[in-house]
């Protein structure tokens, strides 16, 4: 089972690489904060690279702690991406997108720029930080949500709160609640918040004896639900039929099936992954 799922992980990597390249070329460089499609490609590129780094860790080291810390980081990155951008309401998605960007720039200003001495080297982003923050705030104040409920919108802007539950209940969700909101099962959430947290926060289980290769393989096995959610989010966010058609026609699939590690015994596992219980398809 572990081998089959690790082979499936390799297939997911092939899929991610293709989708990431296709979307990055289609939605190329943009300087407009409201260009959410391009911004998503930046996030997607980052996440795909993290999946590749996880593979390298599990193949080339026995560093289970670093691998599981990276797995937890991947989980949070995929959760954030899905929580913000996989929404039926375009207005809600755009408002959260602005708040997410505002949160990042404000944190950059607070944590990086303000501690630099005047004679230290500064990136051009350092000098333009206030300008960018002001531009994002202006976008938020022109959004339909601001006209609809100015008091709540101002509260969300003040706290850069892209994690809000709803305009009617603007409290900030915790990550465990966001895991649930994007569709992870309670069993998966218990694993994320329990077992993975032991490694991410330096708790007792992170001090166990050195892992073996089988334990490292299990990290990829446990990564499958996260990779699955990531691919599902890309497809449901962009809804690009041409991307799927091109992928299914590409030589990448044939190369993967011709690779040394592939076994036709794994096809049943692929079927379970690509066709869900509710008869929906991953791609």
Regions found by a protein language model. Name each.
Residues 1-38, 105-244, 249-283:
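Secondary-shell segments that build the walls of catalytic and ion/ligand-binding clefts
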Residues 22-87:
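Long, hydrophobic/aromatic-enriched structural stretches that serve as scaffold segments
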Residues 62, 89-90, 210-211:
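Residue-level detector of alpha-helical recognition elements and their boundaries
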Residues 67-69, 85-96, 242-248:
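Short, glycine/acidic-rich hinge or "gate" loops at secondary-structure transitions
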Residues 69-76, 91-100, 212-222:
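Amphipathic alpha-helical scaffolding segments
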Residues 78-89, 203, 238, 242:
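A generic secondary-structure signal for well-formed alpha-helical elements
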Residues 87-117:
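Extended amphipathic alpha-helical segments with heptad-repeat/coiled-coil character used for oligomerization
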